[in-house]
């Protein structure tokens, strides 16, 4: 911040404001040193302080170089607001130069509206007390006097990280509520006597192993073993019943075939008996014909009309 302050084109062009600004030579003012008591309250022990006569943007290589000494807030001094603006721009540029980029023109612009600085100081002092209480576990504490809430809007990244840290670590109330939910979910499971009654026999037999395991999630190991043994017993019983049914069906089929074969045998026997009777009848007839023909041949042997006569 060393150098001559120049009033840019963005400053007010009213003659009263320009005349008010030109009455001040900003480089003649020094930055007041912080008493050691304020550093002890903020948790910092510094052995070297910033020299009284230097207004420089380069931080001094001390253990507290990231937090420069703040000016005193005495309402009786005439240089208070100007020193506050210098200290604010210097300290916040060292700690977070990207969040608040104050230039000498910004300081002069803020000096023109210096009648609002007292209200801003009161508002930010209450905000800084709340901010210090909220971040008491951090390694270092930030103090930004005379900076409004709008100026701190750019430095939302550290607070965002802090909120994420709070979200990552569950509070004891959250952990206790989760444990209560787990206990409630365990209490909602029926006892071991009703676990077996939860599924019917048909459901246990028809259900696949994967589906049964999905339904048995959350139950104890003994309950799962007992239910699977029941399912295995029902499966074996069903298999035995199926085998018995198949054997009965096969027996009935064989009995029907046997009955049909017996009937066919009886029919064949009857057919054989009928054919035997026909055979006997034809045999008797043949014998009768043979005897009758022999007699006729003996009686007509002298007849010339017989074939033997011509031979």
Curated annotation (Swiss-Prot):
* Low complexity bias spans: 54-76, 168-194
Q: What is its main location?
A: nucleus
Region annotation Leucine-zipper: residue ranges? 254-275
Q: Which domain of life is it from?
A: Eukaryota
**SMART domains from the xrefs?**
BRLZ (SM00338)
Disordered: annotated segments = 35-78, 150-199
Any one GO CC term of the record: nucleus
Which keywords has UniProt assigned to this entry? Answer: Activator, DNA-binding, Nucleus, Repressor, Transcription, Transcription regulation
Compositional bias segments (type: Basic residues): 157-167
Per its UniProt record, what SUPFAM superfamilies does this chain match?
Answer: A DNA-binding domain in eukaryotic transcription factors, Leucine zipper domain
Task: Report the protein name in the record.
Answer: Transcription factor MafB
Q: Which organism is it from?
A: Gallus gallus (Chicken)
């Amino acid at each position: 911040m060393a150098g001559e302050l120049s009033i840019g084109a963005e400053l007010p062009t009213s003659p009263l404001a320009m005349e008010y600004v030109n009455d001040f030579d900003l480089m003649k003012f020094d930055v007041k040193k912080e008493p050691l008591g304020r550093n002890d309250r903020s948790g910092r022990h510094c052995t070297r302080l910033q020299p009284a006569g230097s207004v420089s943007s380069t931080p001094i290589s001390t253990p507290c170089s990231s937090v420069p000494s703040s000016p005193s807030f005495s309402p009786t001094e005439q240089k208070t607001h100007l020193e506050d603006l210098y200290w604010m721009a210097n300290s916040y540029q060292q700690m977070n130069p990207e969040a608040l980029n104050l230039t000498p023109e910004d300081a002069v612009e803020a000096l023109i509206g210096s009648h609002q600085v007292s209200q801003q100081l009161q508002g930010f002092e209450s905000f800084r007390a709340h901010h210090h209480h909220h971040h008491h576990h951090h390694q270092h504490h930030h103090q930004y006097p005379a900076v409004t809430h709008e100026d701190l809007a750019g430095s939302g990244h550290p607070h965002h990280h802090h909120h994420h840290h709070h979200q990552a670590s569950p509070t004891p109330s959250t952990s206790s509520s989760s444990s209560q939910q787990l206990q409630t979910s365990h209490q909602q499971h029926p006892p071991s006597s009703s676990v077996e009654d939860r599924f019917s026999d048909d459901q246990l037999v028809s259900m696949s192993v994967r589906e049964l395991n999905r339904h048995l999630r959350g139950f104890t190991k003994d309950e799962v073993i007992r239910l699977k043994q029941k399912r295995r017993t029902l499966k074996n019983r069903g298999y035995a019943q199926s085998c018995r049914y198949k054997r009965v069906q096969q027996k009935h089929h064989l009995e029907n075939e046997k009955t049909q074969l017996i009937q066919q045998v009886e029919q064949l026997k009857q057919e054989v008996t009928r054919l035997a009777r026909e055979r006997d009848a034809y045999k008797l007839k043949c014998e009768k014909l043979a005897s009758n023909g022999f007699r006729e041949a003996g009686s007509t042997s002298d007849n010339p009309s017989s074939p033997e006569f011509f031979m």
